[in-house]
Amino acid sequence: MVLKEPPAERIQQLRRLLQRASYAYYALDQPIMEDEVYDQLYRELQELEAAYPEYITPDSPTQRIGEAPVSQFESVSHRIPLYSLENAFTFADMVAWQERWQRYWRTLRQEEPLPPAEYVCELKMDGVALALTYENGLLVRGATRGDGQRGEDVTSNVRTIRPIPLRLALDNPPPVVEVRGEAFLPLERFHQLNQERQAQGEPPFANPRNAAAGTLRQLDPRIVAQRQLDFFAYALHLPEGGSVPLGENQAGEPQSQRQVLYALQHLGFRVNPHHADCPDLEAVKAYYDRWQTARHQLPYLTDGIVVKLNDLKLQQTLGFTQKFPRGSIAWKYEPEQAITDVLAITVQVGRTGALTPVAELAPVQLAGTTVSRATLHNADYIAELDLHIGDKVVIHKAGEIIPEIVRVFPELRPPTARPFTMPTACPECHQPVVRPANEAVSRCGNPRCPAIVRGQIRHWASRDALDIQGLGEKLVQQLVTKELVRTPADLYRLTAAQLLSLERMGQKSADKLLVAIANSKQQPWPRVLYGLGIRHVGSVNAQLLADRFKSVEELATATVADLCGVDGIGEEIAQAVQEWFQDPDHQSLIADLQALGLQLAAALHPAQKALTTEKSLNGKRFVITGTLPTLTREQAKALIQKHGGHVSESVSRQTDYLVVGEKAGSKLRRAQELGIPCINETELIQMCR
């Protein structure tokens, strides 16, 4: 590449061009550059930075995706609490809210006249709240809401979201800028993702919000980048003061929500364009009524509107309740309802053996999706509804997510309708069903029931447990049906040959899954405990127990009294834990997991595991060539070193193995000439076990 100017200058010029183009495209929605031109300049910048790495900076457009996957997210404190909003559901709720803040204001400022009730209304995005921190104009942190005081540090994932600027579009930014906004998945991309997942045998996402939340908790930023999240900013704080654009020829600290939105856009953020100034609650109602209907024309989901007092000083004076800011509120849309027919009632068997009846419905459109099923919980729920197969019913989405039946029309019941009775034999394994005393749920008592095993494996692989990416529902079905997997421990004995015998499983997918399974061994003790699937032990209780009992041996030998001594653990949970560990099958599973190297003690957190793992590659010398299917070169190098091996840059007679990926070069020819064994990624991973 021949340069007309010094490389440092050209690199800076390219960055400015690309950042200006991104600002125009995302913040202003006014593209100034063709995609082909952008791509060409981006590639030139990549090449220059590769040639002159000393000029790479964190805010370069090329550095959005560059961090290696993490083992877990750190908890971080919000400098300014990120509160959720109080919900209103009717206009009467809105009137009551206005009366409350006005009444509270009078208790604070009895001598002063009541300030005007001027509002700014914005669409409430159905996504995931993020808190972004910029220092001297550079993005230094992105965190989830969490409990409002503390969230998870997802900076590496946030950097991949293109509408979020890595550097603020301001020459002299304030020392610290805090931005709040919503990450979401546009509907078109949501449907594309689900098509891709179903083609790969993975379960589809239930809705765009779940997809966005799951994406932000991915440990690998490359996956986040592929999913193409979007972002709208809505709040701005300057904790150390400073000046931002507030209008034409105007700058300073924002005094109104209107100025906040203006400033955000001129700092480089996308702001939802459908906001409005509303001088009173009647105008707010008109805005709400409009979007209650018009929301279905938008390319993303919105589940209500957010109403904020425009005056920021007034908001600040009103402060917060224990849970919510007093100066803003979310007015949720009315849940959509639809009438349909119950075609059948089927029964699902869960991982604990619980039998759950499900209404199979004539498909109907509801809240932007096609609904064909609704949960019926248990036999008592069906009896309370007086529901028959063949009935005409009203369904709605609880929280606009979970479809449920809210009304039955017995007066429209056809002569062919028939009542439903819970089966006395499990629909999966045909063993007897029992209904324990004082429980509304019937259960299959066969621990080897295929449905129970499938549920246990799915739970083990779930996000909050061992988080095994790629182990979808259809794949679990095949593994259990072919009896390749009977317990979670069997996952760690799977071979590439076994996986390749399954439908729709190629070498690349098999390699990727084996890596994900191997990586899950590094998950800490609380996640493993949750993954065991003990009744009543969710992720929160698993953390409580793991904090008190530092190993599986301590927990397995704890008495009910010991367990009840943990704050938050009652007798019912304690009994369930004790009974689980007394089961011989479960004792065998624990022994298996220990032998396989799972983290069943706090002392064997990933940071310590490297010190205790048997060094299976001790003294061996490796060279890596080409692109590996799932591991980056740095990850492969770290894996080899972790197990006692050494990595060299060039092949010599001292090389023990060459790890070969796609587009291998001269190193492969040299290794073949010297007779050095060549292995692929899967074989490397198996050597590390």
Swiss-Prot record:
Annotated catalytic residues: 124 (n6-amp-lysine intermediate)
GO CC annotation terms, alphabetical: cytosol
EC number: 6.5.1.2
InterPro entries, alphabetized: BRCT_dom, BRCT_dom_sf, DisA/LigA_HHH, DNA_ligase, DNA_ligase_AS, DNA_ligase_CS, DNAligase_adenylation, DNAligase_N
Domain BRCT residues, every copy: 612-689
GO molecular function: DNA binding; DNA ligase (NAD+) activity; metal ion binding
Recorded superkingdom: Bacteria
Binding site for Zn(2+): 426, 429, 444, 449
Alphabetical keyword list: DNA damage, DNA repair, DNA replication, Ligase, Magnesium, Manganese, Metal-binding, NAD, Zinc
Cofactor(s) this protein cannot do without: Mg(2+); Mn(2+)
GO BP terms: DNA repair; DNA replication
Catalytic reaction annotation: NAD(+) + (deoxyribonucleotide)n-3'-hydroxyl + 5'-phospho-(deoxyribonucleotide)m = (deoxyribonucleotide)n+m + AMP + beta-nicotinamide D-nucleotide
Binding positions for NAD(+) per the UniProt entry: 35-39, 84-85, 122, 145, 182, 308, 332
A Pfam family that the UniProt record links to this protein: DNA_ligase_ZBD
Family listed: Belongs to the NAD-dependent DNA ligase family. LigA subfamily.
General function of this protein: DNA ligase that catalyzes the formation of phosphodiester linkages between 5'-phosphoryl and 3'-hydroxyl groups in double-stranded DNA using NAD as a coenzyme and as the energy source for the reaction. It is essential for DNA replication and repair of damaged DNA.
Protein name, per record: DNA ligase
Organism annotation: Thermosynechococcus vestitus (strain NIES-2133 / IAM M-273 / BP-1)
